[in-house]
Amino acid sequence: MVVPPSVAPVGNVGNFELGGQAAGLPSGTMQYAGMTWVKKQYKWNPGDPPEAVAGLINEAHASGMKILLSIPGQLAPSSIDFEAYTTFLGGVAALGPDAIEVWNEMNIDREWPAGQIDPTSYVNNMLRPAYQKIKAANPNVMVITGAPAPTGYFGGCGGGGCDDAPYVAGMMAAGAGSASDCIGVHYNEGIMPPSATSGDPRGAGGHYTRYFQGMINAYTGAGAGALCFTELGYLSGEEWGTLPAGFLWRAPYNLTVAEQAQYLAEAVRVGVQSGRVRLIIVFNVDFKTFGDDPQAGYAMIRPNGSCPACETLRQVMGQ
């Protein structure tokens, strides 16, 4: 039995809110942990009717949760139909979700056509038209930019791929601030406490993407206003005794379950106290798959059904 560490409440959270990405909808567990949001991802295909996501919205609201819909799409096969996609988002907004994230990790060629990666194109062709159509349909929907993939791999920014901080700087220069309510952020490779900015044992240990505080600092430095962490995860393989090679950043299994619980709560504290973070969505609440992509290792609800992070998050949120 993992006994989670005791965590002091952060105090006044202001307009900060907490949620989780869930495979199901364990709303009672989530609400116990201080969460008011659930994130669901829907992969858009040209021709999809907006009603395809109505069930997700209705289920969340019936459970007393707000819902963030992350809506990436097909590359089909080498271009994106911006008009069809943004029209779809306008139709979704009319159904009453609480937030929409416009695409996903558009700085890498897994999520954007190779050779066409460009923050200015994203803002002009996708984000701004989407923002206008969403707000026309329902001005209460929060519009979050797609979160870039955190990376220093490209050493800059080009059509084949773009590091996330220069991508965000490019988005802001193109006017993303007036075409969104929040800048999306992903952070899921951490093995250091959330307040740390140095000491990571991996190569490139000084790179900002290794650190939660580093991400806040880098995106703020790139000109971003309010930040919404639409994926925040800490990976523990403790119950399995190991992790796949691509996810093993500190032997034998990155973090203990107790560390995961502590770091998630500390990330909330650091985020709230920064004054920069509007929303944190924990990745994830209840995923059960553990393979080449060890999603269950990120889960708050562990294989034995316990949820140490539920206790630490509840405490830090002052529940």
Please place each PLM-identified region on the residue numbering.
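A structural motif corresponding to the C-terminal end of an alpha-helix
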Residues: 60-64, 94-96, 129-141, 174-179, ...
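Glycoside hydrolase catalytic-domain groove-lining segments
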Residues: 50, 54-58, 184-247, 268-277, ...
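Short, acidic/polar
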Residues: 20-32, 52-53, 80-92, 160-174, ...
